[in-house]
Amino acid sequence: LNFKEYAVINCSVEIAKKLNLYPGIINATLKKIAKNKNDLKQIKINFSDLPLWFQKKTSFMSYYEKKQFLENFHKEPNIHIVFKDEEKLKKFDAKLFKTSMISGFLLDDKNFQDRISFINGDWWVQDFSSFLPLYSFNKINKNKVILDACAAPGGKSFQILSKKLNVILNDKSKNRIQTLKTNLKRLKLSAKILNKDFIQFDNKSKYDIIIIDAPCSAVGTIRRNPEIFFKNKGPNFDKLLSLQENMLERASFLLNTSG
């Protein structure tokens, strides 16, 4: 995670003080961890160290697949970034492994938020797998009305807006909407924003294209979000599946005939 060490330590100590949970011990422990973090990176986990819910869900995997999973898990993920256009990528002054004419993996991703090009809104961070579906939409008529049903934090929406297309951004979460607005401001992009539950959308408005990046378990992003392993219970897969099915059904009523 890209948080400054001193900020993590100070924040943790302040919380410990409020909860009366040994702030002195927490302060000393975190400082020691920060000092020896390179040694900690050498520690390898076994599959049996992972939460029981995850082991059960992956019981179908072969020994080779589990071994491969652990090898990938221990690798630090590179940050994938997407540019507004080809010219901005050409002017980029850092090492980049290109994945398209407007995107690539940062090979030196330390403190990427401090780069002038990031501050100026030339690009945004977006997982490669999230980037691909919209990248394939090369030829979309500018008269098409597009709805991004679960827009925040905005990666897919930014791809569409960068092509000067008409897209309405929706998200159920007020907190995520705020993140979306912050990102739009930095990127100097604008769009109509809705804060609704997509399943409750009425049938009055119709759309030519509906993008659904539905809520999911996030298990596929474990390398970037290892905190998933620290939850007492795993994701409620049945509940998530039901939600995804309901969202797809809702979309079928909101799409134009040729959508």
Question: Which residues fall in each region the model found?
Answer:
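S-adenosylmethionine
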Residues: 1-259
